Amino acid sequence: MSKPSRHRFEQVFANLKIAVEAAGGVMADIVKLNYFLAAEVDQADVPKMRPIRDRYLDVAKPPASTFVAVSRLMRPGWLIEIEAVAAIDD
């Protein structure tokens, strides 16, 4: 995995952690992840993303997840987008 891709994937998870915690939750509250990968992402790099993901999520009980390859994302230059669903107690 190229350094820019690794850095971007790391940044996406760091941002996700900030968002979940701002909502009063923790990363273990995430029950579903949808990964959207732009066509520029080498599909051979997808398995290499797992160690980064594993630093943020409970590897013993990971959330359900789906990977979707798309022609492009909302903004030029975006390569990875993650949609998360979390079950956060009040």
Protein language model regions, located:
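Short, polar/acidic, helix-capping and beta-turn segments at strand->helix junctions
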Residues: 1-90
